[in-house]
Amino acid sequence: MRINPTISGPGVSTLEEKNLGRVAQIIGPVLDVAFPPGKMPNIYNALVVKGRDTVGQQINVTCEVQQLLGNNRVRAVAMSATDGLTRGLEVIDTGAPLSVPVGGATLGRIFNVLGEPVDNLGPVDTRTTSPIHRSAPAFIQLDTKLSIFETGIKVVDLLAPYRRGGKIGLFGGAGVGKTVLIMELINNIAKAHGGVSVFGGVGERTREGNDLYMEMKESGVINEQNIAESKVALVYGQMNEPPGARMRVGLTALTMAEYFRDVNEQDVLLFIDNIFRFVQAGSEVSALLGRMPSAVGYQPTLSTEMGSLQERITSTKEGSITSIQAVYVPADDLTDPAPATTFAHLDATTVLSRGLAAKGIYPAVDPLDSTSTMLQPRIVGEEHYETAQRVKQTLQRYKELQDIIAILGLDELSEEDRLTVARARKIERFLSQPFFVAEVFTGSPGKYVGLAETIRGFQLILSGELDGLPEQAFYLVGNIDEATAKAMNLEVESKLKK
């Protein structure tokens, strides 16, 4: 669907042109506003409350209309704190939904839900803006070709490949490398696809958002010298913000991504961390609006809200939005309505394992738990599919044998099983890879590995051609040629020591 971005000056135009109302009631972040008869705003219109609070401070609170109550009243949800608001304050109907800046001006900057920069780097060019509420692209505009989105990360491309224009769920606890994986993907898409990324921090910790920003500056994803050369736009609505802001910040990020897809005709990567917080904020707003709760206390409109966000994340004939969404699973219950509703929209899952992280294997992607609908012979080809299946079978057999090894030791295994274990350990290490964004910490240069190289490497390990090489030769290398070169270096080093 083509965006028609508006070319306009920033802010609200003169009061005389707009409908004016008055605040009639305030309950937390929810405001009831009375308008003159025949001057009612539409659902999703942005309202601006202007005036002074009880101590004379200037107030400027933006709200979004959610319900028409009758008796010339509307109920709106505030996008920022409502402290200091009083009944009788003047409310301006802007006559349109919330609009945010889009285009190249957003790159390298941090925004809040309203599209206002919050990084103290000065104003942003707001001549090109776009409303955050839009319908999903029409069916006829969708690109239905199934194509793989190559990330340059071996474990992802081989075992759980991403779909171009697809949605990926990223499951992982604290400290297993979600942020580093996200940053590497942003870096790789910028280099290999010339694309841009948009990061939507939905209800996340402020500290994490700050850490991500600092790490992006360190790794060069955000270019401090020439901000326009940056490859990412950041939109944050943290945990401490009102539910209205957390509910809409995902749409703000998506709107920026849609512009890059539809107008600039680029492939865009959209990160949402965390999609569960989007549902949680919707649940809070639903309760504040007085709707009857549904299963487990969630909003009755859960599927509709999730669908309206997810259906806009798609490939069109112009470009694609590939979305990677961190998914928090409450109490590890996958049947909870929030993750269950999210699963229905995902094309692939990337599960990060604490066990692999503890072994020092990064990225700590669990090769057996991660899944993808793209791993089918008719999509990825027979060679890729067969290699992936054999890798999984080898790793699965190793997993089954681990109890026996722990109790009896390797010597008690049959010759065939010992060979399987040796190859599985090589595969496990070869699934690790040095990242560009981790260069500053590890000192080893990052590697982008093409899909063909990845398949060739694993085929050589499975065929037994590399059985003579030590397993540490496969740890943190790019392609298989680097592993053989590393093995030769290790051999030379060991001879020198003797």
UniProtKB/Swiss-Prot annotation:
Record SMART domains: AAA (SM00382)
Keywords, ordered alphabetically: ATP synthesis, ATP-binding, CF(1), Chloroplast, Hydrogen ion transport, Ion transport, Membrane, Nucleotide-binding, Plastid, Thylakoid, Translocase, Transport
Major site of localization recorded for this protein: plastid
Cellular location(s): Plastid, Chloroplast thylakoid membrane
Membrane topology: Peripheral membrane protein
PROSITE patterns assigned to the protein according to its UniProt record, in alphabetical order: ATPASE_ALPHA_BETA
Nucleotide-binding found in the keyword field: yes
Annotated Gene Ontology cellular component terms: chloroplast thylakoid membrane; mitochondrion; proton-transporting ATP synthase complex
SUPFAM superfamilies, alphabetized: C-terminal domain of alpha and beta subunits of F1 ATP synthase, N-terminal domain of alpha and beta subunits of F1 ATP synthase, P-loop containing nucleoside triphosphate hydrolases
Binding locations of ATP: G172, G173, A174, G175, V176, G177, K178, T179
Catalytic activity field: ATP + H2O + 4 H(+)(in) = ADP + phosphate + 5 H(+)(out)
Recorded GO MF terms: ATP binding; ATP hydrolysis activity; proton-transporting ATP synthase activity, rotational mechanism
The EC number(s) this enzyme carries: 7.1.2.2
GO term, biological process aspect, one: proton motive force-driven mitochondrial ATP synthesis
Subunit structure: F-type ATPases have 2 components, CF(1) - the catalytic core - and CF(0) - the membrane proton channel. CF(1) has five subunits: alpha(3), beta(3), gamma(1), delta(1), epsilon(1). CF(0) has four main subunits: a(1), b(1), b'(1) and c(9-12).
Function: Produces ATP from ADP in the presence of a proton gradient across the membrane. The catalytic sites are hosted primarily by the beta subunits.
Family: Belongs to the ATPase alpha/beta chains family.
Full protein name: ATP synthase subunit beta, chloroplastic
